[in-house]
């Protein structure tokens, strides 16, 4: 018995001699990579741009979709190995922001300085009447620590209810009800109405950060789409009395989901983070 335990202990010692160094090397490499990425991000210079579009300019939401198509040019299509793992280079993002204070609503784009020309040209391409100005960061109007004795804050982040390839309701669903530009439904109108009624020193900030993505950087929507469609089709299978497997015809709802997934897969892809913050003086 003692010799058996001793043999196990010797085997464990041999394994540990190999496993511990490998674990420590992997841990060191991971921590080093995190540190390098932090250094890379700290070196980036950012511009805050205020976008002003005349209120009498009528554009369909399709124009903004084209803006995003232009901004997809920020995509690296996969950084080379040395910049990615030795220098900590990561794909940067652009943030589209709405800031309301006391009933005044402003639109901003926060962009890395290296992407500024691309962002401006993408906006001007669809909104030639727009005015793009370099602006101060509105966040700096408030203390760096919130909540405090003067201000209270509430915030939340949003995420998709289903997996990313599933379709969501977009401007096209609103446009189809009323093709007339003057009468079409504006899905943002209720939000802007609420923001326009803020009291003095009340603030609402909405920030949507987008980073271009795709198969070269690890997200293959075609593969994900195939899995979901296969899962939907598998759920339509049923066995008859003889045990023979048959597939029920897809319902109209199922057909619309599959159509929406395929349409989404044909678009430029972005990873996104959506945040909402409400800040007000303490009563």
Q: Which ranges hold each PLM region?
A:
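Extended, folded cores of ATP/NTP-driven motor/assembly subunits in large transport
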Residues: 2-283
